[in-house]
């Protein structure tokens, strides 16, 4: 190996941003060149290559185990030629699973999941590294502006502070807000959102975000699509860099999340950003998926292994705090009976609220607000207020209300109430939800409401 140059110094080259190239040859010297979708750093002396359609390459290596790779730094475009010797093939185990996750992440960006299927992980020993002057250096461009990484000691101190803040949180709403704000204030992750698993176990919904023009609270993601869904489905972190080269992430993949079908279903847009790098980390508690913590950046290849480790710890802390608050809400003491004011007339044009019974989609003055469990909860609250002027409610009575069709999924109610509260605040509608105690909340109505229920046949 080249003296003074180690594989660890080439880490950016192995993040899948720029395709690498491998050259092999038959025993008689006939060459074959193939592009690589993924090169994985194994240790200081070895790399692993994804083998999904390497028939010619595999045949050549059986005859001649030596090969040459060209890898490129996605920021400086410096090139490095690696002379390697084939050592072994792995078809299971930790290395295989890690490489499969990387390959699936690349595939989901281009919609080629059925094509990019890992057959094996081929491990090579690197015997020589030859640096080649990059395009930026040849043009005389200044070095790229690479965001500095947190040093381990600082990261540990700030993670300790995040844990302290989460421990002091008084309810689930504070937990999710502390999570995304703490990532920005303590760990310098300016763009982040937290998505929780829904009751079906097949979708995620955004409950909190930070650093975006639009909060995107209530937007949904399928666990079958995209890097965030992949992180949830595999319960393992997904890290992507130079995403615009992969699939114009901000336009292509995000639009697939937000696609509106011909049935007329409404969706809330995800938090928007011109994304170039992403880390999606599963938030796990007691061996179960609670949600996914997502951090994004407008910088190319902004995140590395250290960021992934930091965010994995953060996601674990957040998941534990969420589950703890959910358990506390389940055993909360019911609120005492309260006397609600008689319904009055406020004057002016009433606010129109239409609820479509098919999926509980709610429209306020013609603008889409929310649907599903949160939509049914809002319908029940507005019906009670319309009938008797009630404004004070408890979580317990909602759990016992069969008309809400609440799912079996444990502690889903509190999450949906927070989702509804945040969505009402974001849209600035004339009725809001405010917590008045553990397991209690109030519906504040500042306008006359004209509630209309629309059956499936009418919609």
Model-identified regions with their sequence ranges:
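Regulatory sensory and allosteric helical modules in signal-transduction proteins
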Residues: 207, 214-271
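Short amphipathic alpha-helical recognition elements used for nucleic-acid or partner binding
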Residues: 367-400, 420
């Amino acid at each position: 190996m080249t003296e003074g140059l180690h594989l660890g110094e080439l880490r950016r080259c192995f993040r899948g941003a720029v395709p690498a190239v491998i050259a092999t040859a038959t025993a008689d010297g006939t060459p074959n060149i193939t592009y690589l979708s993924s090169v994985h750093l194994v240790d200081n002396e070895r790399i692993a290559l994804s083998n999904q359609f390497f028939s010619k390459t595999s045949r050549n290596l059986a005859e001649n185990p030596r090969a040459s790779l060209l890898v490129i730094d996605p920021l400086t475009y410096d090139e490095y030629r690696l002379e390697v010797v084939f050592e072994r093939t792995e078809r299971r185990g930790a290395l295989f699973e890690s490489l499969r996750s990387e390959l699936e992440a690349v595939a989901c960006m281009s919609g080629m999941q059925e094509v990019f299927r890992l057959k094996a992980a081929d491990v090579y020993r690197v015997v020589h590294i030859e640096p080649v002057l990059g395009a930026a250096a040849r043009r005389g461009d200044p070095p790229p502006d690479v965001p500095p990484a947190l040093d381990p000691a600082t990261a540990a101190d700030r993670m300790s502070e995040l844990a302290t803040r989460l421990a002091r949180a008084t309810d689930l709403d504070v937990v999710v807000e502390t999570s995304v704000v703490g990532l920005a204030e303590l760990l310098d992750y300016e763009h982040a959102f937290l998505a929780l698993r829904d009751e079906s176990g097949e979708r995620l919904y955004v409950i909190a975000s930070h650093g975006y023009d639009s909060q995107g609270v209530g937007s949904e993601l399928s666990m079958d699509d995209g890097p965030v869904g992949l992180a949830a489905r595999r319960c393992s972190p997904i890290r992507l860099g130079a995403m615009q080269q992969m699939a114009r992430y901000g336009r292509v993949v995000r639009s697939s999340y937000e696609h509106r079908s011909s049935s007329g279903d409404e969706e809330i847009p995800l938090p928007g950003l011109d994304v170039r790098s992403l880390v999606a980390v599963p938030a796990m508690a007691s061996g179960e998926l609670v949600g996914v913590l997502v951090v994004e950046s407008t910088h190319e290849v902004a995140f590395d292994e250290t960021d992934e480790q930091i965010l994995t710890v953060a996601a674990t802390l957040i998941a534990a705090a969420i589950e703890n608050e959910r358990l506390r809400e389940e055993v909360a003491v019911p609120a005492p009976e309260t006397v609600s004011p008689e319904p009055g007339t406020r004057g002016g044009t009433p606010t129109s609220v239409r609820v479509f019974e098919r999926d509980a989609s709610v429209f306020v003055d013609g603008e889409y607000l929310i649907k599903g469990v949160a939509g049914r909860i809002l319908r029940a609250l507005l019906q009670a207020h319309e009938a008797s002027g009630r404004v004070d409610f408890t979580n317990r009575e909602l759990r016992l209300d069969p008309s809400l069709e609440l799912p079996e999924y444990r502690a889903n109610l509190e999450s949906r109430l927070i989702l509804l509260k945040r969505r009402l605040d974001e849209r600035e509608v004339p009725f809001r939800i405010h917590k008045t105690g553990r397991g209690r909340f109030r519906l504040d109505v500042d306008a006359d409401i004209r509630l209309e229920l629309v059956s499936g046949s009418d919609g």
